[in-house]
Amino acid sequence: MNQKNIYNSWIVRILVMVLLLSFGILLDYLINDIITNQGLFTVLFLFAGMIVIEYARGGSFHTAGFPLDTKTLQEMMLAVVLGMMPIVGLIIVLSFFDLAHISYCSTFPLSGLVPIIMYAIIEELIFRGMIFQACIDRFSFAPTALLFSTIFATAHISNPSFDALSMINTFLAGLLFSFARYHMRSLWLPIVLHISWNCTLFMTGMTLSGLEISESFMKINLSHDIPSPWLMSSYGIEGTAYCTLALIVMGIIISTIDVPPQRQARIFRMEYTISS
């Protein structure tokens, strides 16, 4: 390893990113009463830190996890579909069997989507960003994915109605996002997938990670006859066996996607330069 650049050290990258994360959270906390920023500074500090450190290592925003190539748009569109279809599909099936009744709200504040989007981005930048990549460089993908998915699941433990199946599914979601990041050499897929999933739950008024949605585009009134925890739970769809199956299927679909060769080439060139 080229020791002249301190940012080639995995531990230095982690320490710098943790410091930037702390600054971002502190700023968001201090000015939240003045400006409803919804985690804006945390996102900016994490994103800017990743880009600056990657350029300092000889990389670019491409190798930092934000490649712009022929696959990027397709990757984002797939993420949107993967995030929506399991939820929309379940609603359609439940409605067909008269187990769910849909009503539409006359007013829907679009501003409610802002924290949903921002917190999904923050979680992905923390759990699948540069800290995640630095640990992969040091310990390889499998142990890193297991560790970060465990932390990701544990971070949701204080959510209402969190139980064993919710824990398993949140852990599997962490593995899914981690695999998407590693397989595609990109953060686009996990970020957009996470946003799509959360926004779909929010807009349909369904329970999101145990949290009840008070204002949404529509309201789904669910029958008490829906088998639990197979198709629904007090934690929402994320606490069901259906969600477990959906996460596994999504992982299989993602594994079939071909990674653009230019992504691999950029990373290889940077790693070759670092090691030479």
Where in the sequence are the language-model features?
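Specific transmembrane helices
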Residues: 1-120, 205-276
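Generic transmembrane alpha-helix motif of multi-pass integral membrane proteins
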Residues: 48-52, 130-132, 174-184
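Divalent metal-coordination and catalytic microenvironments
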Residues: 64, 124, 135, 156, ...
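Residue-level signature of the transmembrane alpha-helical core
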Residues: 80, 84, 113, 117, ...
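Function-critical hydrophobic alpha-helical transmembrane segments in multi-pass membrane proteins
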Residues: 102-162, 173
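Functionally important transmembrane alpha-helices
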Residues: 166-229
